[in-house]
A protein has these predicted regions:
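Alpha-helical substrate-recognition element adjacent to the catalytic core
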Residues: 34, 65
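Short, hydrophobic/amphipathic alpha-helical patches that form generic packing surfaces
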Residues: 1-3, 77-78, 82
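Active-site diphosphate/adenylate-binding microenvironment
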Residues: 1-20, 28-33, 40-42, 46, ...
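Active-site glycine/GP-rich loop and adjacent strand/helix microenvironment
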Residues: 57-60, 67-69, 73, 81-291
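Hydrophobic alpha-helical segments that mediate membrane insertion or helix-helix packing
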Residues: 20-25, 196
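Phosphate/oxyanion-binding active-site loops and adjacent basic polyanion-contact surfaces
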Residues: 36-44, 72, 101
Length: 291
């Protein structure tokens, strides 16, 4: 819907910020116009505080994504810039002019390693894939308290990666335990984000299965692809998200992602058969693959 119509409760002249989807799989790009970002900011800050930074007020951030000045229409880059404001003691953006600066990344991580300063490394899944491709035998032992947030899917421009293989590779590369490597689920069409629970579980000493925590103002429901009615138990369906932070547009979003319920959360299993890959991770792979 967002690809075909501008959907907003305010006139176009009152747009404060307009986010566009990556436009990687279709000539039409989803358009999400905001007349006010206060609710978006409140939702993003509350979720990240609860799931990504529950044990620290601020820490050093290393970001494997463009700065919002380089990608002003990206909701992900906007969110990461706000994370730098809210949660960063200092922040290094290692994506410069459409490419990852692997030498800068190495320098920053070596500095953190030497000073025993915990860091949060944030980026798309395929940015981490390209880090794996480019760093060779360089390995790090980041300080206790360090963490990783990856976002986006695992199907890129020319290949698909196994999420478990990537998880283990990131852990081995950075010296961070796999429970402290979590996935964030978001979209241009949404104002809220969902995060995997293992970091918070690990901090609390009660590690459970990987699943996405759903904020209390969001409802995530797997539905039958034929009837669009909710499925029961752990039956796989396509994910519907009701996001009340989308106050100025449409709250109910029907995705093409496969999902099932698990305990108190949701497990996303990838795109439904026949659905085109999309999103920030695919865009990162396309940009970096062109280097």
């Amino acid at each position: 819907m967002f690809r075909f119509r501008r959907i907003a409760a305010h006139p176009k002249t009152d747009d404060l910020r307009v986010f566009l989807s990556s436009g990687t799989t279709s000539s039409e790009r989803s358009v999400h116009a905001y007349g006010d970002l206060a609710l978006y900011d409140a939702a993003a800050r509350a979720s990240a505080r609860h799931m990504l930074f529950p044990d620290v007020e601020k820490m050093r951030l290393v970001i494997l994504a463009p700065h919002e000045d380089e990608a002003p229409s990206s909701s992900l880059e906007y969110m990461l810039a706000r994370f730098a404001d809210w949660f960063g003691t200092q922040c290094t953006w290692v994506w410069r002019d459409g490419a990852l600066d692997l030498e800068l990344l190495t320098e920053v991580l070596r500095q953190a390693e030497a000073s025993k300063e915990a860091v949060a490394v944030l980026g798309t899944s395929f940015a981490f894939v390209h880090v794996e491709d480019g760093l060779g035998d360089r390995r790090f032992e980041l300080a206790p308290g360090s963490r990783v947030m990856q976002t986006g899917g695992y199907k890129g421009r020319s290949r698909e990666v196994d999420p478990e293989v990537l998880l283990d590779a990131i852990a081995a590369r950075l010296g961070v335990g796999t429970p402290r490597i979590i996935n964030e689920f978001g979209a241009t069409e949404l104002s809220s984000q969902m995060y995997e629970t293992t970091l918070r579980d690990d901090i609390g000493g009660a590690l459970g299965p990987r699943r996405l925590w759903v904020p209390p103002w969001v409802r995530a429901t797997p539905v039958d692809p034929d009837t669009l009615q909710p499925v029961h138990g752990e039956t796989v369906g396509i994910l519907r998200i009701d996001d009340t932070a989308n106050l100025d547009s449409v709250c109910c979003i029907q995705t093409a992602d496969l999902a099932r319920r698990l305990d108190d959360g949701i497990v996303v299993l990838g795109r439904a058969p026949g659905a085109p890959p999309r999103g920030c991770s695919l865009a990162a792979d396309q940009a970096l693959g062109a280097q």
